Amino acid sequence: MIKSTNIQAIGSGIMHQINNVYSLTPLSLPMELTPSCNEFYLKTWSEWEKNGTPGEQRNIAFNRLKICLQNQEAELNLSELDLKTLPDLPPQITTLEIRKNLLTHLPDLPPMLKVIHAQFNQLESLPALPETLEELNAGDNKIKELPFLPENLTHLRVHNNRLHILPLLPPELKLLVVSGNRLDSIPPFPDKLEGLALANNFIEQLPELPFSMNRAVLMNNNLTTLPESVLRLAQNAFVNVAGNPLSGHTMRTLQQITTGPDYSGPQIFFSMGNSATISAPEHSLADAVTAWFPENKQSDVSQIWHAFEHEEHANTFSAFLDRLSDTVSARNTSGFREQVAAWLEKLSASAELRQQSFAVAADATESCEDRVALTWNNLRKTLLVHQASEGLFDNDTGALLSLGREMFRLEILEDIARDKVRTLHFVDEIEVYLAFQTMLAEKLQLSTAVKEMRFYGVSGVTANDLRTAEAMVRSREENEFTDWFSLWGPWHAVLKRTEADRWAQAEEQKYEMLENEYSQRVADRLKASGLSGDADAEREAGAQVMRETEQQIYRQLTDEVLALRLSENGSNHIA
């Protein structure tokens, strides 16, 4: 029950006194503050506002605090105000939003608080948490240790902090997000836990997973084994253990069980190779690049690439080159080193291409050899698309069409690989994507694909999958390619440069449609589906109408230009 104790304006802070005033049972309701107490809050907050530092938006915070108190509002939002400290908080609030500030600590928390969103601050610790708390998000801070967790807590997000240990987890917890910390162990999981994110820690052993769990993200830890309970999770559950040094015995056991005819457990994602990353290069950027060139060129190449050492993702790109030299293709494919050297020369001459390539390589953080090989495929695609956009094929429509066909085929193979991944229970998705590209490289004339991969045997891609994929690519190419090509960015770049008048006419036609027909066509579509007035449906319908219009206009333009150019070259089709 609520005790009627006088609030005195002395002591360590109002909230400490309020916590003494409100001795609450779960069914208690907060007592309205007296006018004198309100006045004390306002006076305290006014002093706090005056003592702010440059950059803090304490004036906005003061107004929100005042309104919250006067209206007895349950939610207080002080997010994104660059606040470095908080004053005592209104005692009646149940939700506190303080995201994206500069806070290093928090005051005592209101006794009825249920939700705290305090992510993206500089918090080093948290105060005692009220027993009523149900949701805590304090991700992206500097917290080293958590206080006792209330029994009613259901959602805990403390990712990207500096935690070395976790307290006992409360029995009602349904979501635990602790990725990006320094944990090497984890307490037992509550029976009601449904979601777990534990990636990028140092965990060596997992507790048993409760049957209620439907999603467990465990990437990049030090796990060599998994508890047997992982196989007893529901069929629609998802477990990701990529980037862990699972033992050979564990891998074989998982593969044997998950491929059995009676398996009805979760889908488990893994990765071949160990858990090391290539984010830390063995050599400087210049040294990693020059290693691909003959000795008589290395001095000049090194001087050129020294200038790029501080560009974004340069370190990751350097590490990628180190790993690329250790792939099957680098060891076995004739002319591979010369191909890489020629590509690096093109990168040194184009800042835009270099920036794009560095960004693509930044995704290849896993040390798995086939992950590096797939990234090399993507870098080759980036180069060719860049060259097409910059004009290399302006006078060679046949070569541009061939490149377009290859990009189209690769897109379809990615769709097929994505569908295949969904059917597998124990899967390294990188191996699946690479398998379709590598094994069909010759039949589909994929110049950007490596011709060998190391771990095809664990991809789960069968000979029948490959035959079906080839047939699907050819069928879709026959029916869809010209429409796809007419919307392809590099083709548009060619048209703008070489067919400026025709391109301008097409753009004018598109804008006339937008002015005269667009609104009515969207309205008609919404009316036909009974969704008039639905904002989400309107956005979707608008995008569909725009795409259909562009498809019609650009397809007509494409047909005209290709008919002219191909007839000049003695061809009457776009094959």
From Swiss-Prot:
Pfam families: LRR_TTSS, NEL. Keywords: Host cytoplasm, Leucine-rich repeat, Plasmid, Repeat, Secreted, Transferase, Ubl conjugation, Ubl conjugation pathway, Virulence. It catalyses: S-ubiquitinyl-[E2 ubiquitin-conjugating enzyme]-L-cysteine + [acceptor protein]-L-lysine = [E2 ubiquitin-conjugating enzyme]-L-cysteine + N(6)-ubiquitinyl-[acceptor protein]-L-lysine. The active site is at C368 (glycyl thioester intermediate). This is E3 ubiquitin-protein ligase IpaH1.4. It is an enzyme of class 2 (transferase). Pathway: Protein modification; protein ubiquitination. Residues 282-575 are annotated as: E3 ubiquitin-protein ligase catalytic domain. One of its GO terms (cellular component) is extracellular region. It is found in: Secreted; Host cytoplasm. Residues 271-281 are annotated as: Linker. The LRR (leucine-rich repeat) domain forms a slightly curved solenoid and may mediate interaction with target proteins. Exists in an autoinhibited state in the absence of substrate protein, probably due to interactions of the leucine-rich repeat domain with the catalytic domain. Is activated upon binding to a substrate protein. E3 ubiquitin-protein ligase effector that inhibits host cell innate immunity during bacterial infection by catalyzing 'Lys-48'-linked polyubiquitination and subsequent degradation of host RNF31/HOIP and RBCK1/HOIL-1. Host RNF31/HOIP is the catalytic component of the LUBAC complex, which conjugates linear ('Met-1'-linked) polyubiquitin chains at the surface of bacteria invading the host cytosol to form the ubiquitin coat surrounding bacteria. The bacterial ubiquitin coat acts as an 'eat-me' signal for xenophagy and promotes NF-kappa-B activation. Its main location: secreted. Ubiquitinated in the presence of host E1 ubiquitin-activating enzyme, E2 ubiquitin-conjugating enzyme and ubiquitin. LRR repeats lie at residues 69-90, 91-115, 117-130, 131-150, 151-170, 171-195, 197-209, 210-233. Its EC number is 2.3.2.27. Belongs to the LRR-containing bacterial E3 ligase family. One of its GO terms (molecular function) is toxin activity. Interacts with human RBCK1/HOIL-1 and RNF31/HOIP components of the LUBAC complex. Residues 1-270 are annotated as: Interaction with target proteins. Residues 284-575 form the NEL domain. GO terms for biological process: protein ubiquitination; symbiont-mediated suppression of host NF-kappaB cascade.
